[in-house]
């Protein structure tokens, strides 16, 4: 990214990564095509959301990043330029810890990459939970309304105040929800 290269040598490019399968394409592209040309030391990676599972669980957003990208890029180091949401911790405690971490490390995200679920959710904020978008803290605990899986989710303020907020939408399975948002005016977390 040109913006990352344009920053002074000590400035970092802070990216918040979406979860689910959305960023897999990006991770594979980086690992296979740009692993040796990306200035990794200039990037700091944070997460938009995480399921409350350990990183070894297939459902872990950080776990996917680790397997698909960071395991093959030695410059990506947890605690240095990779800051995961600790999914195996209590969601309430982790939302507080991660909120404080982000407040202390990131004035403003350079880029927030969001996905969209087939139901219109983003950042583990589901339809009917739109009030969580206006929570005062950067991260909050959330719960999937059907599976009851606990999660930690970024709220609306960091998304809206990022220098760039990108919805990365892949696959024909997303066409219906995109059509409903754009053409039918569906009100859901992703449309706000």
Per-region residue spans from a language model:
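N-terminal glycine-/serine-/threonine-rich phosphate-binding loop
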Residues: 1-15, 92
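Glycine-rich N-terminal segment of FAD-binding domains in flavoprotein oxidoreductases
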Residues: 9-34
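Glycine-rich beta-strand-to-loop/alpha-helix junction loops that act as flexible
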Residues: 17-22, 114-118, 170
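A glycine- and small-aliphatic-rich helix-loop capping segment at beta-alpha/alpha-beta transitions
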Residues: 29-39, 63, 67, 127-136, ...
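Ligand-binding beta-strand-loop-alpha-helix segment within the catalytic cores
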Residues: 38-113
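A short secondary-structure junction signal
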Residues: 95-96, 123-128, 177-181
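Class I SAM-dependent methyltransferase SAM-binding "motif I" and its flanking Rossmann-like core
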Residues: 111-157
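ATP/nucleoside-binding phosphotransfer catalytic cores, i.e., glycine-rich phosphate-binding loops
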Residues: 157, 163-192
């Amino acid at each position: 990214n040109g913006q990352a290269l344009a920053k002074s040598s000590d400035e970092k490019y802070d990216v918040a990564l979406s979860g689910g399968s959305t960023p897999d394409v990006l991770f594979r592209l980086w690992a296979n095509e740009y692993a040796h040309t990306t200035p990794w030391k200039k990037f700091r990676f944070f997460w938009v959301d995480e399921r409350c599972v350990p990183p070894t669980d297939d459902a872990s957003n950080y776990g996917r990043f680790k397997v698909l990208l960071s395991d093959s890029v030695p410059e990506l180091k947890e605690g240095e330029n990779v800051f995961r949401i600790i999914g195996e911790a209590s969601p309430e405690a982790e939302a507080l810890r991660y909120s404080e971490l982000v407040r202390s490390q990131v004035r403003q995200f350079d880029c927030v990459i969001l996905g969209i679920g087939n139901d219109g959710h983003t950042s583990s904020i589901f339809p009917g939970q739109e009030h969580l978008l206006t929570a005062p803290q950067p991260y909050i605990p959330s719960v999937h309304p059907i599976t009851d899986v606990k999660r930690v989710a970024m709220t609306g303020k960091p998304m809206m105040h990022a220098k760039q907020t990108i919805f990365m939408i892949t696959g024909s399975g997303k066409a219906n929800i995109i059509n409903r948002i754009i053409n039918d005016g569906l009100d859901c977390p992703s449309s706000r």
